[in-house]
A protein has these predicted regions:
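A cross-family structural signal marking well-folded subdomains
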Residues: 1-113
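Short intrinsically disordered, low-complexity coil segments enriched in acidic
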Residues: 1-6, 164, 173-174
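Intrinsically disordered, low-complexity N-proximal targeting/linker segments that flank membranes
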Residues: 69-169, 173
């Protein structure tokens, strides 16, 4: 493992950059910590000739990533999925017809949105990241939610309207 330690470390750094582009700024907001492993491996493999920096490659990596999150595919039995995904994504980058298993098997039932009430859910964290990515603004300052605002304002994804406020106003839970 020592032979590849520096390359893998660089891969994790690149994976962090991709996650920040997708508005995942902290480990507590990471939908699946387990999906970070194949993401970092892919970033490591694609570092050669800076392939990971190209838009077309990055777009496919992000598509694979979000299919894994919203398909809720990294909750258990991940070691086999790591292999399928790394091999599958690398093949997909060479041949667009070779879609990786996670992208092929992706399915998100919209009814699932009604049950996302816990910030511990990967899909909940994913939705919050997608909201942040789509130019949402801070309620107080009106500034677009970027890394600077996220850190400066100690943004948390657990709720928009505080429970105590809703209860005092008699608002229904759902």
């Amino acid at each position: 493992y020592q032979r590849y330690a520096n390359d893998l470390t660089d891969g994790f750094v690149e994976a962090e950059k991709i996650l920040q582009e997708e508005r995942i700024f902290s480990s507590k907001d990471l939908p699946y910590t387990t999906q970070l492993i194949p993401l970092a491996v892919l970033c490591t493999l694609l570092a050669e000739h800076n392939r990971i920096k190209t838009t077309s490659v990055k777009d496919k990596i992000k598509q694979w990533y979000w299919c894994g999150v919203f398909g809720e595919m990294y909750g258990s039995a991940n070691e086999t999925r790591y292999v399928y995904d790394v091999v599958g994504v690398m093949a997909w980058l060479e041949d667009a017809s070779k879609t990786p298993k996670t992208v092929q098997e992706f399915y998100f039932n919209p009814v699932r949105l009604l049950s996302l009430q816990s910030r511990l859910s990967a899909a909940y964290k994913g939705i919050m990241a997608r909201i942040l990515k789509n130019q949402c603004k801070d309620f107080i300052s009106g500034r677009e939610m970027d890394f600077t605002v996220y850190k400066a304002e100690s943004i948390d994804i657990h709720h928009i309207f505080p429970r105590d406020y809703c209860e005092k106003k008699g608002l229904p839970r759902a």
